[in-house]
UniProtKB/Swiss-Prot annotation:
Residues 1065-1076 have a biased composition (Acidic residues). The gene is RAD1. It comes from Saccharomyces cerevisiae (strain ATCC 204508 / S288c). Its main location: nucleus. This is DNA repair protein RAD1. It is found in: Nucleus. Present with 1400 molecules/cell in log phase SD medium.
Amino acid sequence: MSQLFYQGDSDDELQEELTRQTTQASQSSKIKNEDEPDDSNHLNEVENEDSKVLDDDAVLYPLIPNEPDDIETSKPNINDIRPVDIQLTLPLPFQQKVVENSLITEDALIIMGKGLGLLDIVANLLHVLATPTSINGQLKRALVLVLNAKPIDNVRIKEALEELSWFSNTGKDDDDTAVESDDELFERPFNVVTADSLSIEKRRKLYISGGILSITSRILIVDLLSGIVHPNRVTGMLVLNADSLRHNSNESFILEIYRSKNTWGFIKAFSEAPETFVMEFSPLRTKMKELRLKNVLLWPRFRVEVSSCLNATNKTSHNKVIEVKVSLTNSMSQIQFGLMECLKKCIAELSRKNPELALDWWNMENVLDINFIRSIDSVMVPNWHRISYESKQLVKDIRFLRHLLKMLVTSDAVDFFGEIQLSLDANKPSVSRKYSESPWLLVDEAQLVISYAKKRIFYKNEYTLEENPKWEQLIHILHDISHERMTNHLQGPTLVACSDNLTCLELAKVLNASNKKRGVRQVLLNKLKWYRKQREETKKLVKEVQSQDTFPENATLNVSSTFSKEQVTTKRRRTRGASQVAAVEKLRNAGTNVDMEVVFEDHKLSEEIKKGSGDDLDDGQEENAANDSKIFEIQEQENEILIDDGDAEFDNGELEYVGDLPQHITTHFNKDLWAEHCNEYEYVDRQDEILISTFKSLNDNCSLQEMMPSYIIMFEPDISFIRQIEVYKAIVKDLQPKVYFMYYGESIEEQSHLTAIKREKDAFTKLIRENANLSHHFETNEDLSHYKNLAERKLKLSKLRKSNTRNAGGQQGFHNLTQDVVIVDTREFNASLPGLLYRYGIRVIPCMLTVGDYVITPDICLERKSISDLIGSLQNNRLANQCKKMLKYYAYPTLLIEFDEGQSFSLEPFSERRNYKNKDISTVHPISSKLSQDEIQLKLAKLVLRFPTLKIIWSSSPLQTVNIILELKLGREQPDPSNAVILGTNKVRSDFNSTAKGLKDGDNESKFKRLLNVPGVSKIDYFNLRKKIKSFNKLQKLSWNEINELINDEDLTDRIYYFLRTEKEEQEQESTDENLESPGKTTDDNALHDHHNDVPEAPV
């Protein structure tokens, strides 16, 4: 069997090393459990010592409140451990082995190959781990928390747990003991906790009742720091999608808090993306350190337990896999060659222009690697403000060319040409762009790509409309299946699996029209008609813009010799190679003067549609299009749509689309529409069904088991779905489906699939060798202590404090020092800054703040803005309102502008973003659709002029922000959470501290000083007014005559009176805007919207 579908076994050396590592990990866990002394006394001693230190530190607010004594007994006694019979739903031996090894291995990171049933294994493992534990002879339900789970993961885990619960209830005998028959304790409820679903009290009750909770990291951090749940109440934590966690993620913050207070609970992490653990320097050890993991379990496809289970089924299977190798058309082959050459030259030019940044890995051998673009971005983005504009364009061109390569094999000719034409239009001279063509358009092979893309649509005054070669092969396969069903009488449906929803919709239309008179050509004609209509609307908008503005005259780009040829100056009428020179000149003008569609726009498309089909067929097509739109509307009401095609020859089979439609498709479902389509529905036998679905919607083994297809057609290669088919065939040995595996031969599709298989195998090989040499990590309770960083801080503080050394050597002043406290808005826990503050020994107190994001002292308040948030806040003028609130309540309002660690420390990259159908594939110089760099700086300057006392801090990374906050807190008092919470709300206490009064007096003084900005007002006039009028508000209420009596100058009175009236109107408008806003603080783009009842109050 070809290596495209099945992967052979690995080397014997790797198999032996995997077995040795698994055995060693399990044995080390057993030895630790057997030899572990009773360290409860030691823990008490350490806690007593910590409490003494805390008493000496005079802690203002406990980070995690001390729980009653019964919490300390939450650790299960090893003497109470007893065997329990638990039924699992894992049919394959290697899956059961994964659960067994995960249970006996302490704090393990389990990395599996794609498509081996990870979610089923996780659900069964959760079912086992949530078994009630025996504490002091009494059963107690376990509390297991699931972190970093996607919404679809929660749905599938919940379904699997319900099935496991049903099996457990049906398997109980009547003779069981009274303890085991307690259904309430042995139930394992699964709940999903989000900010919008549960309030504080409901979450507190859930924590106490136990069970399995899938919770967002932001909510869990707040609950841990606020004392809603104590770490000792948590039996263990399970982290999904560990490969997606960033450095200093919230999950690592949670696990650090959990392990610092709970040393006996378990931590498990799962991933099925081994490639992410070999991309950087020692990423496996880094990830294990962040997640507090101690062991690694590797389960690749070539592991002997897995391969023996899956390959044995393949050898005995009667239904072999049929590989359908489809050849590319001549036009597609030429386009693929041209795109690869363009990529080659763009990569070479990027390396030539940036030799100090270029990597040897940037070559054509790795260009199809999924991490190729990520590798370029990781190097170029941090230096984005230093590289030239041509280099920026090359980076975007490489991304766009890869996108075109993918579109070549996944989309039809019309969509591909539309993408090419869109790129040409985007590189025409524009009002908002001062540069010329994108570099890839200046390559000689670009003309080859453009010409053949046009040729697939229009050639020699007629529409060619080249069909996708896979469509014809798919129709032939379905015909063969139809004939086979006449003899074997298989009852299962036919499943067609593809990559995305758009392909599903396109295949449904193609199969519907395959047996009609015009067939697939009619589908392409309708799509081309729609494309022409969109082009006409776009041109109208362009003309409106062009009529208002003019083009820049000097719009040129410095093109290197790689992308240009010098024009030869000669007097000869004929020049050798003139055709090539003309082609290059034509390409130069492709994006400026020549419209690639002008050649066939005069050709009447409506006549071509009617040609050979007649008016009746055209009306039928329009009726089908209307029916399709209605069907799409019904889709969101049901998970399946039924496409009626009475002319189909697939045994009168019906096409059924399973999966989610694109989000832009809206529904207008009503009773009349439903009643209209009720008569069109009829019963369809399973063997006549053709199900079209995406790989994403089939991303679990349960989907295939529910459908039970007799035939599976893989329209595109996908390594994960291939493994799912193998697992499904191993489960249903008697009813194995017949599989058709379609791919383009000698294409980037085939090469990408082979590269993905090789990349996964190489990643597992590196992980096996790295795990063999991985150093063991040991830690004590002192290492887990949160207060390990405070010693250096106290020494630094003691040097700054000017204490009297004659009074007990200055110890009294040192004794009064307390631990640093920072009050953080609960919505800021999506960022990594609160976790870094915690790691640096600062007490982080979550509160619902109306004013500011971080309160570091009673006088200093920070409003943190990432660059994207800053641009959005400047646009909607929200930042000005936030600064005004901080200025009202704090003496030192501060705007903190924070960049990410991997970003360029400049506003230039962010001012170059704009929407271009897909922001990741833009090939134009992007003048920001939000704000340009000059506009950002201008708005910031206006903000500073409006609020002179506003401080601005620029931080290149969250780590630098921590250092800045530590420096600002040196020698200053700690903030009060109760005061910080009520600022900006209606619950202002009458006995508010003197700080508010001082701020009010300072505000009055600053308002009076604005009078000096009025032309003609001298200092003498200013002091005369201050001597007679003490309050600025009282001055605003004076009439013109009263002000004139004070000044005795009518001209000056007019100016002052106008100034006061203007100030009063602005204040009234601002107060109106504040009343319209909600009492709680809203968030920016990356903040999570919360309700007030979902956030805890300040801990006391």
